[in-house]
């Protein structure tokens, strides 16, 4: 249901503080990689779109700390919706900086971009899979084409001999939120995100024949690396096909309480559609009139409950047509890997 409300209807809320702190940490690490790549190209300065000029050859810890402070100032002004008891505090800055240093110092800088041959920092990919199985057509939305993959990769390094390594930084939990299971070395091999990165990297960097995909859980376990070769591409495409068909053929999205009842508390604490109602929007909010529902009788339904109710009443096509956020268009995305359209 969360996928449907966010990416089909465009109903997205503000980020939580933990996620926003992760964004800040990512940005600090991104700048170190951008500086290293620029230094490899003989450039002394980069002009970052968020914090301005940064020298590429200054590796002093104090300088990186100052970069972190500039990043933190920029994003806390951007993420100014954390107020009251949840307002930004000195401890938050200390967390962001310590997380970045933790990633950089691991095993004497094994994953420090400044000690690597950087191929790309934050490269974007956006392409269609031009296969028959990837076709879609929705005449009611004037929408047709092929499944498109779009995203952003944190870091790509050249290890030599046709081997590239992708590093994806994670500041959150080492957990698959879809299944509730913890990631480990065994189940990461078929991780959809890493598989998608491999598929994209073969397009971006055809000169490489082998890719190491490292997902680095900074605070919950460290780096985990899986190895993909050209021979894995067929299985990767099959995983993408099954996921695409599952989404395409869904008439009634599943909800967390039905999938994992013990995790249903997350609906009202972590999910925007579960925490908010349609009050104050262009959609008329509904009162709960059915006994035994998650929303108490007589209270305003959450967005999730109302969407689910209307799907049962009118069907998913009707809800998609009438509940889509103003200005939102299915199939359009913003400039970043995790953004819905700007």
What residue ranges belong to the model's regions?
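Metal-dependent nuclease catalytic regions and adjoining charged, substrate-binding loops involved
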Residues: 60, 186-189, 198-342
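Short amphipathic alpha-helical segments and their helix-coil junctions
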Residues: 1-13, 166, 174-180, 243-251
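Charged, glycine-rich intrinsically disordered N-terminal tails and low-complexity linkers that flank
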Residues: 1-59, 296, 311-342
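Short coil/turn segments at secondary-structure boundaries
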Residues: 6-9, 113-123, 257-262
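Mg2+/Mn2+-dependent nuclease catalytic core
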Residues: 123-242
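A non-catalytic, helix-rich entry segment at domain boundaries
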Residues: 28-135
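A residue-level signal for conserved active-site and pocket-lining positions in enzyme catalytic cores
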Residues: 25-26, 155, 213, 267
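Hydrophobic (often cysteine-bearing) scaffold residues that line and stabilize catalytic clefts
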Residues: 17, 21, 25, 92, ...
């Amino acid at each position: 249901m969360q996928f449907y409300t966010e990416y089909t209807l465009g109903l997205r809320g503000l980020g939580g503080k933990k996620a926003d702190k992760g964004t800040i940490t990512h940005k600090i690490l991104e700048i170190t990689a951008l500086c290293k790549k620029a230094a490899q190209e003989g450039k002394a300065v980069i002009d970052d779109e968020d914090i301005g000029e940064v020298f590429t050859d200054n590796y002093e810890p104090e300088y990186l700390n100052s970069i972190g402070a500039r990043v933190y100032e920029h994003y806390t002004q951007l993420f100014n919706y954390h107020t009251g008891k949840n307002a930004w505090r000195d401890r938050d800055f200390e967390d962001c900086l310590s997380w970045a240093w933790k990633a950089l110092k691991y095993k004497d800088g094994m994953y420090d971009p400044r000690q690597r041959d950087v191929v790309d920092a934050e490269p974007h990919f956006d392409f269609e899979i031009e296969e028959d199985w990837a076709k879609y057509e929705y005449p009611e939305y004037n929408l047709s084409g092929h499944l498109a993959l779009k995203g952003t990769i944190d870091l790509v390094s050249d290890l030599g001999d046709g081997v590239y390594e992708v590093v994806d930084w994670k500041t959150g939990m080492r957990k698959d939120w879809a299944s509730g299971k913890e990631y480990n070395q065994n189940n990461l091999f078929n991780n959809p995100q890493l598989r998608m990165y491999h598929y994209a990297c073969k397009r971006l960097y055809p000169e490489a024949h082998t890719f190491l995909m490292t997902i680095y859980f900074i605070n919950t376990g460290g780096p985990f690396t899986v190895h993909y070769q050209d021979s894995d591409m067929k299985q990767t495409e099959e995983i993408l096909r099954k996921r695409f068909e599952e989404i395409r053929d869904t008439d009634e999205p599943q909800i967390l309480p039905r999938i994992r009842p013990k995790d249903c508390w997350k609906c009202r604490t972590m999910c925007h559609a579960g925490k908010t109602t349609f009050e104050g929007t262009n959609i008329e909010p509904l009162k709960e009139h059915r006994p035994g529902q998650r929303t108490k009788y007589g209270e305003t339904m959450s967005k999730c409950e109302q969407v689910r109710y209307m799907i049962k009443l009118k069907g998913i096509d009707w809800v998609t047509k009438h509940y889509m956020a103003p200005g939102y268009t299915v199939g359009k995305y913003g400039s970043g890997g995790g953004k819905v359209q700007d």
